Amino acid sequence: MKRWYVVHAYSGFEKSVAQALRDRISRIEIQDRFGDVLVPAEEVVEMRSGQKRRSEHKFFPGYVLIQIETYYEGGVPRIDNECWHLVKETPKVMGFIGGTADRPLPISSDEADAILRRVQDGAEKPRPKVLFEPGQMVRVIDGPFNDFDGLVEEVNYEKNRLRVAVLIFGRPTPVDLEFGQVQKS
């Protein structure tokens, strides 16, 4: 049975560590003892220079998840020495998280399912990088109401838009804006 283990990698090198693990696994031809290698992340959408940009936000910077064939020794989950050495000797890997240095423990099935669900949700619906709440003060930074301050009345994450009450001639006037047209005050 394959279980998920957490590997501590140098921060910023998670993707290269994941690729190195995949390469080493296929080179040694022990794919049957490994499953997925995953850098848990979600896609976020932000506005830069009036353009929507998609970027990736890692849930756990510095960590890589890997599925490894697990057997039980006295009721305790274990991985074989060859798998352990393959992971530990991968460049930019600092070790396993959980258990002891030479006897790592897998994360629970519930934790693994929650992480995988979160990754799936992030892939299906990219979320905005900046979150807004009704009642929050914002400053308009783009469009005809540039440099006006306003109060967020309504937020629509599906369309990446919000309704802001902007003071025009001393009266609050609702204006529909994109997330990229405002910044938090």
Curated annotation (Swiss-Prot):
**GO biological process, alphabetically ordered:** DNA-templated transcription termination; regulation of DNA-templated transcription elongation; transcription antitermination; transcription elongation-coupled chromatin remodeling
Pfam families listed in its UniProt record: KOW, NusG
Under PROSITE patterns, the record lists: NUSG (PS01014)
Q: Name one GO cellular component term.
A: cytosol
| Name of the molecule in the record | Transcription termination/antitermination protein NusG
The record's InterPro entries line, in alphabetical order, gives:
KOW, NGN, NGN-like_dom, NGN_dom_sf, NusG-like, Rib_uL2_dom2, Transcrpt_antiterm_NusG, Transcrpt_antiterm_NusG_bac_CS
Gene3D superfamilies reported in the protein's UniProt record? 2.30.30.30, NusG, N-terminal domain
Q: Which family does it belong to?
A: Belongs to the NusG family.
